[in-house]
UniProtKB/Swiss-Prot annotation:
Bilayer topology term: Lipid-anchor; GPI-anchor
InterPro entries xref list: CC4_RECK, EGF1_RECK, EGF2_RECK_dom, FnI_RECK, FZ_RECK, Kazal_dom, Kazal_dom_sf, RECK
Protein name according to UniProt: Reversion-inducing cysteine-rich protein with Kazal motifs
Propeptide, chain numbering: 937-963
Posttranslational modification: Localizes to the plasma membrane via its GPI-anchor. Released from the plasma membrane following cleavage of the GPI-anchor by GDPD5/GPE2.
This protein's domain notes: The Kazal-like domains mediate the serine protease inhibitor activity.
Knot repeats: 31-78, 98-135, 145-191, 210-257, 286-332
Disulphide linkage map: 627-652, 629-648, 637-665, 710-729, 718-744, 755-781
Glycosylated residue positions: 80, 194, 291, 346
Entry's family note: Belongs to the RECK family.
Amino acid sequence: MAAAVAAWPWALFCLAAVPPLLSPGAAGLSCCYHAKDNLMCRDVCEQILSSKSDSRLKHLLQRAPEYCPESMGEVWGCINSSLPGVLKKSDGWVGLGCCELAIAVECRQACKQASSKNDILKVCRKEYENALFSCINRNEMGSICCSYAGHHTNCREYCQAIFRTDSSPGPSQIKAVENYCASISPQLIHCVNNYTQSYPMRNPTDSLYCCDRAEDYACQTACKRILMSMKTELEIVDGLIEGCKTMPLPQDPLWQCFLESSRSVHPGVTVHPPPSTGLDGAKLHCCSKANSSTCRELCTKLYSTSWGSSQSWQEFDRFCEYNAVEVSMLTCLADVREPCQLGCRNLSYCTNFNNRPTELFRSCNSQSDQGAMNDMKLWEKGSIKMPFINIPVLDINKCQPEMWKAIACSLQIKPCHSKSRGSIICKSDCVEILKKCGDHNKFPEGHTAESICELLSPTDDLENCIPLDTYLSPSSLGNIVEDVTHPCNPNPCAANQLCEVNRKGCQSGELCLPYLCVPGCKLGEASDFIVRQGTLIQVPSSAGDVGCYKICTCGHTGLLENCVEMHCVDLQKSCIVGGQKKSHGTSFNIDCNVCSCFAGNLICSTRQCLTEHSSEDERQKFTGLPCNCVDQFVPVCGQNGRTYPSACIARCVGLQDNQFEFGSCISKDPCNPNPCSKNQRCIPKKQVCLTSFGKFECSQHECVPRQLNCDQTQDPVCDTDSVEYSNVCTLYQKGKNLAYRGPCQPFCKSVEPVCGHNGETYSSVCAAYSDRVAVDYYGHCQAVGVLSDYGFHTECAFVKCPQLSATGCKPVIAPGACCPLCAGMLRILYDKDKLDNFARVTNKKPITVLDILEKLRLHVSVPQCDVFGYLSIESEIVILIIPVDQKPKPLQIEACNKEAEKIESLINSDSPTLASHVPLSALIASQVQVSFSISSPSVKVGPVLHCLFISFSFTLLKLMDYI
């Protein structure tokens, strides 16, 4: 036991293979009696012996020496005998505590079985396992230094604290070592000083030797100039990207050298352990979309747990990167590397791409602009070099130079279609330019202009390719583009931050920027994909198994934490519909309903349909409402928090009679009778739940502690007297009633009820917006709105619709609404089982419509548009992306349309841009409808409407900002 105890300081015990559930029994717990005089040790002992989780047990064992000193041999001897096989001596291998930092699985296993660093050198490659070797070096140094402490416990503990973390030791830590160890061991002080003195910031010129690794002479020169003139890491990285005309790649010798020098030269430099998400969890998500097993395996190898060899990268480039049949995987990878963003401006070479605020581009920046000019210079030499073919061309300065410039700029700036997100030029343009300007005598044997273009641009479908004539002339908008702005494009934030549109406004006296830089996490050590801190993220299993995912939290350390494995989904399962096989992920229509096959399960909307085969009797009974319910508005409130127009419709969507009650949900008082305890206050919190309310209670209130003193949290709310408070606590402390969340608005002082698109009557426009519900018309809800393409509902004829917000707009009518509006509209199918699983493995709370809206809102990049939505009575989530100005310009309406089309495409393609986020990954199919501009100055609406719709208070940007 003495030998075992001596190993404690460096976490030299580890979990062996043991059954996951241990039952210590009374004999085991009696071990802790030996620690009766040390309550902290006794508590840890009891936690160890009662732990039912391997990971929890491992954590406790690593922390135990801090509470149970080595002198308590009886405790450790008893634990060893009570949990045989759990504690294993590691014979002095100080690197054991670092093994979890290994990226490659085989390296991690070798580390756990090793007895010295030499044992892992053949398996673990230093160039890839920087974090592991840095940790081992630190522990080796710590083992030597702290051994001088002998049996002096305090000195040893303060010494160990210096080496326990991979961050720089603070002055107080160093001072503590001096105080406790100076009189005990001068050698220890000298050893620690040698270690801590390596921490001052490195001089950038120390890395000048890396510049010689650059393959391009211009890059070598720029690198040396930058390292000798710039000081901060951010300046240096940005300068190198601009000077070398390349983005950082881990396989690039220059960047590889910088990584090695910054991480492993000093043993204490900060190196975060890689998360259990593979090297790039976002790109790993794309691998399952590969059409061929070869590309799927290569993709998985490159982005899972260890860097692929240079041969793997070359093979992926050769067989997959430009393969037209792999368009689904390649588009997905492009979404991760360079997501499509609205707007392009400030280019000096590709000037025809400027001033296009409502078009999508992947790479509108100065580097790509310069890259296009460089490409043109290379092509002037008479050859266009592609990875799989060289294309000989005539003098491009004389033969269609503007067309060639448009091609070079398109390849670099990468315009992308709002629906397909494709960035390739159209085949007809490719054939035309090669027929005119290709050097046919030098074409590769057997190739023609058509065959070459079949490899490069195999389609003329305008939803999947970019026509070049768009960029042969400047934008028709000129410089008048201020109607639509893009605060996050180009990205103003640091590399570890996420840029978000500032919709909250600013406190008085604050510098108010149109964007917010929020801390985030990367989805893997080699990932540039940033997610918001505090959010739940879905990532593929790090092994890359298709259909296997885990849910993680983006923690405050900037790393993904608390990962929980989900049940694997069989993506090979198909659905049989009408005798036809439908593959996973396929969306299609059955009559008027949109359906999707998800892992063998058929998920459809519940629209009532008329078909060409419908009988005369069916046509006469047809109402357009679910189950052909009668067009009567007698609202009932379901236990999911949704108001349904009638009991018939509630039953049709699956509610039992005991699962709804008459009256709208908003009219119910969830705090009467009071469901909270005496020391708590009941606060109404209306929500519409998407999860099964039988599994996760859809409560309409929250119980909060009664506080004498409220904190200073700024989360403005407005009471029923139009008085504003800093937060809900302050409002209730004053004995007031909540009217709506968000700052008080002058126009809401005179309370006038409005009907939301969800069929709920709100006390004011502000109250509706606080639920992120847009307004259909003024007054109490009185009708079931339009649902069917086959006709209209007579009750809407009695509704007075406001004036339309813009002329020249062909409006949309949201399902269940009466009045038209200028907006982009999405009707989305979701997987309820998946949402239930998310709720089960996370916080056991229901997932709501508001959860979806708040997440989608972050993906709308134009501040002139905002997101509203509701659950329709046809089992779809309806999303409305609406201009916020009272009289929106055509450009703003178009921007909202493009945002809607972009989100539809991301949902339908299962792009990691959305699918990485919980709960957005449960959105499986979407249909978009946009209110495009028409030439006529006025809009004629159907006879039932006779009226036009105003966007009510979409001028109220301040209100939008807080809601």
